Structures are given as structure tokens and as C-alpha cells.
Amino acid sequence: MDSLQPLFEQLFGSEWGGPLFLLIKNLLLILAIVIPLLLAVAYLTFAERKIIAYMQVRVGPNRVTFFDIPWLRGWGQPIADAVKAIMKEIIIPTGANKFLFLLAPVLAIGPALAAWAVVPFSPELVLADINAGLLYILAMTSLGVYGVIIAGWASNSKYAFLGAMRSAAQVVSYELAMGFALVCVLMMSSSLNLGDIVAGQQGGSFLNWYLIPLFPMFLVYFISGVAETNRAPFDVAEGESEIVAGFHVDYSGMAFTVFFLAEYANMILVATLASIMFLGGWLPPVDIAPFNLIPGMVWLLLKIAFMLFFFLWFRATFPRYRYDQIMRLGWKVFIPLTLVWIVVLGMVMQLPEVVRQSFPLNLWFN
């Protein structure tokens, strides 16, 4: 694509051609990430309904199809749901702050999409390959809670506001544990660049992945990710049996759908980061044929799908935690555990080279 830059400079001049080319190039790259992401979100909802239906000995969506093709029954359900949401009216409650009520979904979906700018899908395919990629993602994901808080406050509903406060406290609690877990990855890779983190796990087999030395941190990260996305069994912010539907109880139509998209986009982001930082990213489990003949992006997508399956499995299996249980798990279990692991990891990294060579520590520590 860079070969087209001289053509733009010839058509529009050197002063305007270069910037215009970069603008169009970046817009196309953004669309190349956002459009597949939205399709993935749509069909993740379909997969969720089918998997949970299978676990509950049901059929799931099996009516909407494409061109009456029998083996595609149900595959048109996400498209039908999107059309229905677009056609529905956005009802603004009496007494609500209209501007903030409509701004809240934008504040929720914006960071959820912006975080994908630094996520690499292969060594070459990344929108913005910045050195502080991990820090950028943590900053973007922490901004999503503002949309939730504003939605709860602007709705002028006690149920929505209670759900928003629950969500804010929960996200802050588990963000600390998630951040400390990622500090361990940073210590092992010595980089905040996601591509460098994957490169640090190269070595020919899955034994070099950070999953093995950081397995407790992997569990802390993933469970904290489930809690941050308000998924079951941590979905107290949307507890139907307690506060009707949580912070988006008064939302309808596309406004509700945007919150829905943000939640599932964050789910995919958590699964993607788990795959990149602990499961070797696009690296094959063993660097021999036929595994190394499969494109790296295929391996990354398979790992993401594997991690997403646990999100769906949790929803079908576990009952909702009480709010005090969620807070206790975050503050009294995860945060102390991550702090202890950081100290232990730092001590191991300071061991002499002779001691490291007597144990298989050189697999992960260079």
C-alpha cells in the first residue's frame, strides 16, 4: 500500500499528498480492525447462545437462515438482532439528562474499540506498534467505567445508579489485581510492547510460554478480566434478580446495543491479551511441521476462541457471587497474591546465572 504514496503526491502535490495518503491508509487500517471485530462480536453472541443451549440440552437459535439453506439455520440470527435493534426507538426517560444519557454509550464503546489500535495479530499486522502498548491498553480499558457511571447517573433511576456504583467499585478493585498480574509479564519480557512480549516466548515449544512460570498470575488476570467485563459470575452490576437490569435498565434500541457491543468487545480483548501475554500469541505450540506451517494469525485466533469459551462456560455453570464475596476475592486474595508473586519473581530474577542453569529457569529468563 505504501507504493501508492508517490501517486498521491503526484495528484495532490507533495504538501497535501503525503498527509492525505497517511490519513486514508490509517482509516482503512482502522476499518480493517473494527469491521471484523463487530462481526466477531455479533457471532460471539450466537456462539454463546448455541453453547449454553447445548449445555442445557436445548437447540438454541435455529430459525433465521440465509437463502433457506438448511445447514445455515440460526446463522442469520445476529443479523436479524442487529436489524431489530436499529429499528427500535431510543426512549429517554422523564427526568433523565438527555445529553449525558446519549453520551454514556459512546464513552463505553470508544475505549473498547480504541484499545485494539496496539494489539498485534502477527509480527507485521498491527495498527500502531508503540513501545508502551500494554500501558496504553490498561489506560483505555480503565476509561470504559466512566460510560457506565454516567449511564447510571443520567438515567435518573435508583436501580441504574446502584448498578453503576457496583460496577465502578468492582472495576477499580479488579483493575489493581489485573495490573499487578501484568507487571509479572513486564518483568519477564522487559518490555511493554506486545510484539516483544510474544517474541520473548519464542523457543520452539509451549514450554517457553509465560503460562507455565506465571500460571497463578494467568488465573488472576483471566478471572479479573471476567470481573472487569461484568460477566457471570461477577455480573452484579446487571443483577436481574436484584436491580432489574443494572446501569442500562432504561436503555433501548441502538443505545442499549452499543453497551452490548462494548461488553463483548472487551471480552474479546481480554481473551486476546491472555493469548498474547501467556499463551505465546501467534506462536505454534511446537515449532515443527505441520504446526509451523499454519499461519500465525490462525494460531492466535484459535487461542482467542479457546479463552472465549471459558467466558461462555462460566455463564452457564456458576451462580452469581454476592457483592461482598466479589470484593473479598479481589482485595483479600488476588491483590496479596499478585504482590507476593512479584516479590518472588524479582528474587528469582536476581539469582546468579549458575543457579539458574541448574534449574530449567533459562527457558523464560534470558
UniProtKB/Swiss-Prot annotation:
Pfam families: NADHdh. PANTHER family: NADH DEHYDROGENASE SUBUNIT 1, NADH-UBIQUINONE OXIDOREDUCTASE CHAIN 1. It is found in: Cell inner membrane. NCBIfam families: PRK06076.1-2 (NF004741). GO terms for molecular function: NADH dehydrogenase activity; oxidoreductase activity, acting on NAD(P)H, quinone or similar compound as acceptor; quinone binding. The lineage of its organism: Bacteria, Pseudomonadati, Pseudomonadota, Betaproteobacteria, Nitrosomonadales. Its EC number is 7.1.1.-. GO terms for cellular component: plasma membrane. Belongs to the complex I subunit 1 family. The keyword DNA-binding does not apply. It is an enzyme of class 7 (translocase). Keywords: Cell inner membrane, Cell membrane, Membrane, NAD, Quinone, Translocase, Transmembrane, Transmembrane helix, Ubiquinone. InterPro entries: NADH_UbQ_OxRdtase_su1/FPO, NADH_UbQ_OxRdtase_su1_CS. NDH-1 shuttles electrons from NADH, via FMN and iron-sulfur (Fe-S) centers, to quinones in the respiratory chain. The immediate electron acceptor for the enzyme in this species is believed to be ubiquinone. Couples the redox reaction to proton translocation (for every two electrons transferred, four hydrogen ions are translocated across the cytoplasmic membrane), and thus conserves the redox energy in a proton gradient. This subunit may bind ubiquinone. This is NADH-quinone oxidoreductase subunit H.
